[in-house]
Amino acid sequence: MGERSAPTRRVDPLGGLLVVDKDGGMTSHDVVARCRKILGTRKIGHAGTLDPMATGVLVLGVERATKLLGLLTLTTKAYTATIRLGSATTTDDAEGEVLTTVPAGHLGDAEVAAGVAALTGDIQQVPATVSAIKIGGERAYARHRAGEQVELAARPVTVSRFEVLARRDVAGFVDLDVVVECSSGTYVRALARDLGAALGVGGHLTALRRTRVGPFTLDHARTLDALADEPRLNLDMDEAVRIAFPHRAIDAREAESLRDGRWLDPVGIPGVYAALTADGTAIALLEEKGKRASPVFVVRPRGLVD
């Protein structure tokens, strides 16, 4: 039997970012596995995770751009979601077993608005039990599925926007379509749970769609089917760096120094930022400490593109 040929690589070694509009029912790892097949490379990783039930923005790094993932500032996220008031579940979403059912049709809009307002701003939130948080080296969701009683400590999170867009009264339940803008580490499922608890009727999430993570939005995203039909990156390395990081302009001499891993004089930009040539080519990501702006990642080291 002959050996199977390797899949044809569809991207250059420099790579870039793939912003996927994830379908429901897939894990983040499922998305990575399919993208590896479509693009013909194993050098793909994802920044953060998205629950299987959720749809929307998932950021993947391809080829050399996998090294960008740990440097991206993805601290703010935005979602649209549907919360059902009147029913609590074991997982705080529609995939769990129903714990309680309480009629919620009596709730007035003002009561709901007050409950939403109390969960907006800087709050302490107990993460969802079925979460990827590690307890003693094991994920909370794994312990929960093994039948263990999981208790997680409250954590500070910021919910900068929590707004009800529409309300529907359905068979004693109240379904709320909401938009949430929040810090990384915020669980929208937990917002649904806590809103229902505060209103005395229980609550859980029935739909979740991530519309933005950091600077990347649904406008940047493509579905896996679209990717399969036209295998290409959403953002090449230069585009990805320009969108994701502040930047400074450098001349040809400075570019050559950075390609060799040498440092430049600082210019006062905080955090990690990009060094771009006049034509927008990304050479390196820098961080300033003292009197040096040193590379934390050389995008185009000497020898890679020579």
Swiss-Prot record:
Belongs to the pseudouridine synthase TruB family. Type 1 subfamily. One of its GO terms (molecular function) is RNA binding. It holds the Pfam family TruB_C. CDD domains: PseudoU_synth_EcTruB. It catalyses: uridine(55) in tRNA = pseudouridine(55) in tRNA. It is an enzyme of class 5 (isomerase). One of its GO terms (biological process) is tRNA pseudouridine synthesis. Responsible for synthesis of pseudouridine from uracil-55 in the psi GC loop of transfer RNAs. NCBIfam families: TruB. InterPro entries: PsdUridine_synth_cat_dom_sf (IPR020103), PsdUridine_synth_N (IPR002501), PUA-like_sf (IPR015947), PUA_sf (IPR036974), tRNA_psdUridine_synth_fam2_C (IPR015225), tRNA_psdUridine_synth_TruB (IPR014780), TruB_C (IPR032819). The keyword NAD does not apply. The keyword tRNA processing applies. This is tRNA pseudouridine synthase B. Its EC number is 5.4.99.25. Gene3D superfamilies: Pseudouridine synthase, PUA domain. It comes from Nocardia farcinica (strain IFM 10152). The active site is at 51 (nucleophile). Keywords: Isomerase, tRNA processing.
